[in-house]
């Protein structure tokens, strides 16, 4: 999945932007809920401290929608560190007054809801929905299930914006937006744009 996320991010890379995709060798294969998130932290922090620094990179994108370890990682470097959940919620509130999120498993809902509150978007968030599609199975083959849940978010929640709550859903946003006739945000593209914008602002 790391390679697929890197490919999705590359589609939003501006001229001169290069992407290095890394994944901790230890820890769970995917992050689905708080237990997986906690289990991955030692490997994530070790990888971050060993390979990422202010001189080597201009920005860091955390490609887990749970924004695992994000607040701690922001403290460790002076460059922008952006989580895809964080970026998606900010983008959603710029495009509409309300949003609903479609994620993978129900186990992730409490983490995402806590993050939404921490970012200050509790009033704009209507609901976090679970498609019950495991992270490693997300893709074009499960598109119908995710589309169904996204349509319910529009029809039942009456949200202005739909947020796709998994990095693996990045390739679905454009087509879903056209079908649902409203903005659909994936965190990978949102985080890429925010990272590049913040880097340019720092260089100005």
Locate predicted features:
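Short, well-structured alpha-helical segments in soluble
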Residues: 38-56, 144-159
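Short hydrophobic/aromatic-enriched beta-strand-loop microsegments
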Residues: 79-86, 121-128, 182-189
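Glycine/small-residue-rich loop that forms an oxyanion/phosphate-binding "nest" at active or ligand-binding sites
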Residues: 40-97, 101
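N-terminal beta1-alpha1 ligand-phosphate binding loop
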Residues: 1-13
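Periplasmic-binding protein-like
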Residues: 57-64, 158-166
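N-terminal beta-loop-helix "entrance" segment that forms/cooperates
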Residues: 17-45, 136-139
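Active-site rim beta-loop-alpha module in soluble metabolic enzymes
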Residues: 108-165
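Short, flexible loop segments at boundaries between secondary-structure elements
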Residues: 185-203
């Amino acid at each position: 999945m790391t390679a697929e996320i890197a490919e999705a991010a590359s589609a939003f890379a501006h001229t001169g932007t290069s992407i290095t995709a890394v994944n901790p060798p230890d820890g769970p294969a995917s992050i689905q809920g708080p237990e997986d998130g906690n289990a991955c932290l030692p490997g994530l922090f070790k990888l971050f401290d060993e390979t990422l620094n202010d001189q080597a990179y201009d920005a860091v994108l955390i490609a887990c929608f749970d924004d695992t370890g994000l607040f701690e990682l922001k403290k460790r470097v002076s460059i922008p560190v952006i989580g895809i959940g964080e970026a998606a919620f900010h983008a959603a509130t710029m495009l509409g007054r309300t949003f609903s999120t479609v994620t993978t498993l129900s186990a992730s809902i409490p983490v995402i809801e806590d993050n939404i509150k921490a970012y200050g978007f509790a009033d704009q968030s209507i609901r976090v929905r679970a498609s019950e599609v495991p992270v490693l199975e997300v893709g074009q083959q499960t598109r119908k299930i995710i589309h169904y849940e996204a349509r319910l978010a529009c029809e039942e929640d009456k949200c202005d914006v739909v947020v796709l709550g998994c990095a693996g859903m990045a390739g679905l946003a454009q087509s879903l937006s056209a079908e649902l006739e409203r903005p659909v945000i994936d965190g990978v593209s949102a985080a890429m744009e925010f990272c590049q914008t913040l880097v340019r602002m720092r260089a100005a």
